[in-house]
Amino acid sequence: MKSSIVAKLEALYERHEEVQALLGDAATIADQDKFRALSREYAQLSDVARCYTDWRQVQEDIETAQMMLDDPEMREMAQEELRDAKEKGDQLEQQLQVLLLPKDPDDERNAFVEVRAGTGGDEAALFAGDLFRMYSRYAESRRWQVEILSANEGEHGGFKEVIAKFSGDGVYGRLKFESGGHRVQRVPATESQGRIHTSACTVAVMPELPEAEMPDINPADLRIDTFRSSGAGGQHVNTTDSAIRITHLPTGIVVECQDERSQHKNKAKALSVLGARIRAAEVAKRQQAEASTRRNLLGSGDRSDRNRTYNFPQGRVTDHRINLTLYRLDETMEGKLDMLIEPIVQEYQADQLAALSEQE
C-alpha cells in the first residue's frame, strides 16, 4: 500500500482514538450537541479504524512468517502462513481503499421517491403500484418511515404517479441507484389472449435538503393553486381546498401535495419537494456537461435511462447497467432489494477507484 495512504489511515486511526477519549469526558457528555456530533464522527471512523488495525496485524504476521522461512523445520508452515496472510492483506487493502473513497454528503439523508407510470396505460399504472409496494417493503425491512405526499391513482388500481418521503438511516445512499427507467414484461390481468405486454415506469430519487441548502426560489417565480384532495382519506376528502399545486415557472417543474388537511403543511412539503427537484435538475445538467467517456451508473430519473427489466413469465429481473440477471423476481417484488443494490454499489465504487487511480 502507498505510504501516502498509510499516513492518511494512521491519522484517521489517531482521530478515532481521540474521539473515543472525548466521548468519555464529562464536559463532552454535558454538551449534548457536541456529544451527538462526536458520536456521529466516531461511528464514521470505526470501520476504517477496525480495518486498519486488522491490516497492521496482518503486516506483522507477514514479517514473522518471512523470518521463519530461514528455519528449515518451520519453512513449510511459514510458507502457508505467508500465503494466507498476503491474501488477507490484499482483501483488507481493497476494503480500506473503498472506505477512503470520498463520501457523498447526501447519502445519509432522507429521500423523496417518485414513481410514474410511463408507456403501457393501465398496466403501467399497476406496475407503478407494484414498484411502490416493493420500495415500501424494502423500507419496512430497514425500519424506515414512508409518508405518501401525493398520489394520482390509476383507473384500475396502482398509480399514474406517486411521490413519497422515505425517512431513516442512509436512505438516499441505498436508493439513489433506483433513478431511471424500469420495464415490466408480463401478461396483464385484462389480456384475454395471454399475450405478454411490455410497460414502463420511471423512478426518480432525490435527497431531502436541509433548509440551509435549499436553492434560492423567488416567490414571484411560483404559481400556487389550491384544489380539493382526492383519493383515499375518508370523510375529510373533498371538503376543503387543502391540496396544493406549485408550478416553478422558469423550469416548468410542477409539484403537488395533498397529504395533510392543513394547506400550510401541504405547501411546506411541496416546497421541500420542489427544492429537491430543482437541485436534482441542476446536478443532472452538470453531470451532462461533465459527461466523460466513463459510464454514469447514477440515473437521472429519465425514461431513457434503462435500469431494469422485470420479466414475470420467466421470473427474471435484469439490471442492464451491470449486466446482472437474477431468477428471483418474487423475492425482488417483496422488497428484497439488497441482492440488486449491493452489486451496483460495488460496481460504482470500482468505477470511483478507477477514476482515482487515473488521477494519480
Curated annotation (Swiss-Prot):
Native organism: Klebsiella pneumoniae (strain 342)
Keyword set, alphabetical order: Cytoplasm, Methylation, Protein biosynthesis
CC terms in the record's Gene Ontology section: cytoplasm
Modified residues (N5-methylglutamine): 235
Pfam families per UniProt: PCRF (PF03462), RF-1 (PF00472)
Highest taxon in the source lineage: Bacteria
Stretches the record annotates as Disordered: 285-313
Main location: cytoplasm
Any one GO MF annotation of this record: translation release factor activity, codon specific
Intracellular or extracellular location(s): Cytoplasm
The family this protein is said to belong to: Belongs to the prokaryotic/mitochondrial release factor family.
Protein name listed in UniProt: Peptide chain release factor 1
UniProt PTM: Methylated by PrmC. Methylation increases the termination efficiency of RF1.
Function (record text): Peptide chain release factor 1 directs the termination of translation in response to the peptide chain termination codons UAG and UAA.
